[in-house]
């Protein structure tokens, strides 16, 4: 890049994607590149490109990059000695100052207990735990050392991957378990008893909490695959909830327009008003910690109270299907079919924002779509009871694979 006339600013240490995003904005740069597999296993290592606003690049930009990269790969690339004389950048303090504007640390530090943190061998280590410790909080941390294979699994803060954190939470009697993925843009949360709290539920809780505490009557943005608990919270507070296609890049414009107090996706992405047009797992974990300190209640107790206040329960399910090539190729055409009924449920609304989403007359729903990043089909469902959501997911699986 330098040989092509670009001025390069280099972060010499592993840097979380949201920190890079903030550095782009803070230093008025034209963009940034992070080499990461994100939440995926090491074999998926690639690059993330962020634009001048710090947000994920839009599809037309990433597609152009892919075409140019493929052409370079076909022609062959010659390398020569690279002088290690780039301008160094330490983005830590400016980013921490930004977090101090977003988080009420005076509230968080009143928490009566410790927090457990799992870095999953990702670059969130030394960031989330550091800022908590800097404010006098007791933090018990695990998997903070560099491991390029992530223990042979992947740095996804999913329920299955957080078993070591669960043991730590129970052993240390922590108020909650906090986790970030490989590049620290996604979050994972465990309650004080070690129970995994779905990212969907965290989004609903934080949305409600921000409206109660920040003095801003703004709406929320959620992807088409994300819980309708967000809509229920919006209705409770009389604010609008915007639906977008899957992909955090679609949330940024609403944030910049000042229309939303929170933007989120069921895949554990979150940002808030005044912050970055990029998901930030560090921020999300800090908001959850602040919320626990402020309400002095477990997350499940808070969720039950929220269900009571909105008048319904919301239980989402997500399923990934690895399909034969032939089935995968046919899926987009099949998703164009029209339904008046699906698996015994009467269809009240069909949404084709991203894939096929069928909303039923009882408020439950199913979304089926091909993944944009992996060779799989994704199924998302939601119902007022966990068993009903599971059944819907199985019905969708049967339809796709028939």
Residue ranges and their predicted role:
Residues 2, 12-14, 67-96, 191-264, ...:
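Proline/glycine-rich low-complexity loops and linkers
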């Amino acid at each position: 890049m330098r040989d092509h006339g670009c001025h390069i600013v280099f972060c010499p240490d592993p840097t979380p994607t949201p920190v890079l995003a903030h550095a782009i904005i803070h230093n008025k740069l034209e963009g940034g590149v992070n080499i990461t597999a994100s939440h995926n296993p090491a074999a998926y290592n690639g690059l993330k490109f962020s634009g001048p606003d710090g947000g994920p690049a839009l599809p037309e930009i990433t597609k152009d990059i892919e075409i140019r990269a493929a052409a370079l790969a076909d022609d062959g690339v010659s390398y020569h000695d690279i002088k290690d004389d780039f301008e160094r950048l330490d983005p830590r303090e400016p980013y921490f100052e930004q977090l101090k504007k977003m988080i009420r640390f005076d509230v968080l530090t009143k928490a009566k207990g410790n927090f457990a943190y799992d870095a999953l061998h990702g670059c969130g280590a030394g960031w989330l735990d550091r800022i908590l410790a800097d404010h006098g909080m007791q933090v018990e941390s695990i998997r903070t050392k560099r491991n390029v294979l992530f223990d042979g699994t992947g740095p996804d803060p999913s329920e299955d991957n957080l078993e070591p954190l669960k043991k730590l939470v129970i052993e240390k009697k922590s108020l909650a378990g906090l986790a970030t993925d490989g590049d620290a843009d996604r979050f994972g949360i465990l309650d004080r008893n070690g129970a995994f709290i779905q990212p969907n539920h965290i989004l609903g809780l934080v949305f409600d909490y921000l409206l109660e505490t920040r003095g801003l009557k703004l709406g929320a943005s959620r992807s088409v695959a994300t819980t309708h608990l967000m809509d229920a919270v919006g209705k409770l507070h009389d604010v609008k909830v915007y639906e977008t296609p899957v992909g955090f890049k679609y949330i940024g414009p609403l944030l910049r327009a000042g229309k939303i107090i929170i933007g989120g996706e069921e895949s554990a992405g979150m940002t808030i008003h005044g912050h970055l047009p990029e998901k930030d797992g560090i921020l999300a974990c800090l908001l959850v910690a602040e919320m626990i300190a402020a309400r002095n209640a477990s997350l499940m107790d808070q969720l039950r109270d929220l269900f009571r206040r909105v008048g319904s329960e919301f239980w989402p399910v997500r399923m990934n299907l690895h399909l034969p090539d032939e089935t995968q190729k046919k899926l987009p055409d099949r998703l164009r079919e029209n339904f008046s009924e699906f698996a015994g449920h009467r269809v009240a609304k069909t949404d084709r924002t991203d894939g096929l989403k069928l909303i039923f007359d009882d408020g439950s729903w199913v979304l089926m779509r091909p993944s944009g990043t992996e060779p799989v089909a994704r199924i998302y469902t939601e119902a007022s009871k966990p068993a009903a959501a599971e059944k819907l997911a199985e019905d969708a699986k049967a339809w796709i694979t028939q």
